[in-house]
Amino acid sequence: MMTETLQIRQIDDANKFQFISLLLIGDESEKMIGRYVDRGTLYAGYIGETAVAVCLTTDEGAGVVEVKNLAVRHEFRRRGIGRRMLAYIESINSGMTIQLGTGETPSTLRFYESCGYVYSHRIHDFFSDNYPAPIIEEGITLTDMIYLAKKAGHQSAD
């Protein structure tokens, strides 16, 4: 398969909400997105002039950058776009620890682990405490937020 050219651009604060449909793929609660979007930096991945992916990061201090939202349009998945978005975030934050939180969905955990992220910690009952309705992915009702981390600029040990 031919690798599509993915251009990644930082989005101005004033334009972040133009990407709400993509952000809602990564986090289905507009209220939750509102809790981090203003303090985050948004990057959009384009193929041609079409925005196909987003990644929103926050500076958590102490050398930690958190990926709050990573999303790829459904029809563009399984093409390495999410992996390229993460690699870009790592490249511009070399030497920093990149952390991210996700539900206990096996395919999502496998994806991040294949990118070199390792288990860090969990926040018990995060989804049930912060979302009005249950979130079900791959038949699993999400309860805990699983955090994974990676030192940017370091290869995984495989």
Segments and roles (model prediction):
Residues 76, 80-88:
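Conserved acetyl-CoA pyrophosphate-binding loop and the N-cap/start of the following alpha-helix
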Residues 44, 50-59, 63-71:
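Conserved beta-strand in the GNAT
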Residues 111-113, 117:
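Conserved active-site tyrosine of GNAT-family acetyltransferases
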Residues 1-14, 146, 154-158:
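Conserved N-terminal entry element of GNAT/NAT acetyltransferase domains
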Residues 92-104:
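Conserved GNAT acetyl-CoA-binding A-motif
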Residues 99-101, 118-141, 145:
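Conserved catalytic-core motifs of GNAT/GCN5-like acyltransferases
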Residues 70-77, 103:
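A short, internal acetyl-CoA/4′-phosphopantetheine-binding micro-motif in the GNAT/acyltransferase core
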Residues 10-17, 22-34:
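Helix-loop element at the rim of GNAT/NAT acetyltransferase active sites that forms part
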